[in-house]
Amino acid sequence: MKMYARLGLLTAIGVLLFTACASAPITTESTPAGAPRPSARQSQATPRPAVTPLTPIESLGRTGTPIDVDIEAYRLVLDGLVDRPLAISYDELLYYPAVSQVPRLECPGFFVDYAEWKGPLVRTLLEEAGVQAGAQEVQFCDGGALPYCRTLTLDEALLDDTYLAHTVNGQILPPEHGYPIRLVAGSKLGSYWVKWLFHIEVK
């Protein structure tokens, strides 16, 4: 019995570690009765405290192993329930209108960072591709042999703080932080910020 109890404890610890950056929004406060609710393009992310300095790139928390990328051959594919599938090169992505924000990057129990991430809104690409009626969610996957994917609702993907970062703190993304492109989802925990982004699928 002691052996089974020990195995149960180890399993529980493993689950906690795996779900440390689980799928829950940072802000947990409910909207008071009668208060206006945010629109589809307004985020409920926790704002950056005014006195908190930017986290240096070398101090940013990170997980995962960088993926080797042939930047000349790289294409960010956007397909699924769209009228015009896209295959966008890295250089083309750099020419898209970009936003620059300082969202809260949190992996509960491990790190909370504030850095300035810059890149085009996901909404811009979705509008270019033409989202079809009936689409409900958007999946983001890296380019690994066994791709790591996270899914946002379509409304979350259209938020003003959901974008594709190619720059952090004024510098090109380092490989360990998602070069060439990393999803920034300001209303979500760090597990949703997919690094080494290769594929966006509208479902």
Give residue spans per PLM region.
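Bacterial N-terminal signal peptides that target proteins for export
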Residues: M1-G8
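Bacterial lipoprotein signal-peptidase II cleavage site
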Residues: A22-S30
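Structured, non-membrane catalytic/scaffold regions adjacent to prosthetic-group chemistry
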Residues: I26, G34, P38-K203
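C-terminal motif of bacterial Sec signal peptides marking the signal peptidase cleavage site
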Residues: L17-A20
